[in-house]
């Protein structure tokens, strides 16, 4: 391992940004960048200091004595897991059927427990003891885009969809079998209105009346945490009426949230180039993310046509001071919902790395979230994901309502008896 590689590894182990390392050792940020690029070498004393600090931090690693244990269903690429781990939890079981999503998940969470595929094949006895059931159950059957598409094709949707709609009931099956103290479910905002509200009524009826949980719901807009207008519904259930209320959680001001400048590649040499997203000494965004003349003309013509009809279809063009639209799983097709304005030439798409930042997977002072898949798959995966810091906030909000006994010998989990 070269000195440059060691410095980067040490920094990532400590979950620190280059600027934070700069403050720690008393050298300017540009010098830290040069160290990691191998263009200069730090003094031996500085390198030894970083080694010692990293060693001390890693002797008390998180999740060794977790505050609670949780299972991650319909796990996707691990956004719910990241948020719950940041709240002090430990994942003990994962279920995700999509091979590409699983590839990304396993690249970031090396296996230390069973990883199941099809949830319909999971038996209750296959799942280890846990305190919280976490599930972002498949959202497409209930999303506005998904319903419109299925209606146009004459296909069933929601709970009538044989491939995905009934998967909520697989969640209910495990809740009924295990009776965990708490569950948290996440879905698209349109779940509330789907099928004139009947779908949501069935879900709440199952959770409250059939399973006997105290259930609380809230639609949360992520733009207080990340520069993206993204509304999702969170459904939290407690086995006992614990007195929980979303009103007691502290959410950031949605009118004072971050802007896109906080997640865009700076292209000024202050970050290391990451192929294939950025390149060169200044780490400029690769030209492949710039729209071709043909695609840019098509998007402009398409927007003009629909504006004349009085509807809102069209591209979204944004700059560093803006907040973006919702990143969707179809972003890989043309990137039209979030295009980045450039001083010269056609606009560009976000890179997958910027998408990771936009969804809160990459945060200051933490190692890069690994993206081992193609751009097409990455766009789909981040578009289907949750915003990590939103999940973290909700997860921390339930902690006071969980029992505190969490030793290996006495987990909170209690199986159904009788």
Task: Cite the ranges covered by each PLM segment.
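Class I S-adenosyl-L-methionine
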Residues: 122-132, 144-326
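DNA major-groove recognition helix of helix-turn-helix/homeodomain DNA-binding modules
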Residues: 42-60
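C-terminal target-recognition/interaction regions appended to catalytic cores
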Residues: 18-21, 28, 43, 287-418
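Conserved hydrophobic/aromatic packing and binding residues within compact polymer-binding modules
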Residues: 7, 21-22, 32-35
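Core alpha/beta nucleotide-donor-binding catalytic domains of modification enzymes
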Residues: 57-179, 189-193, 198
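A short, Lys/Arg-rich alpha-helix, primarily the initiator
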Residues: 1-13
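Recognition helix of helix-turn-helix/homeodomain-like DNA-binding domains
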Residues: 26-41
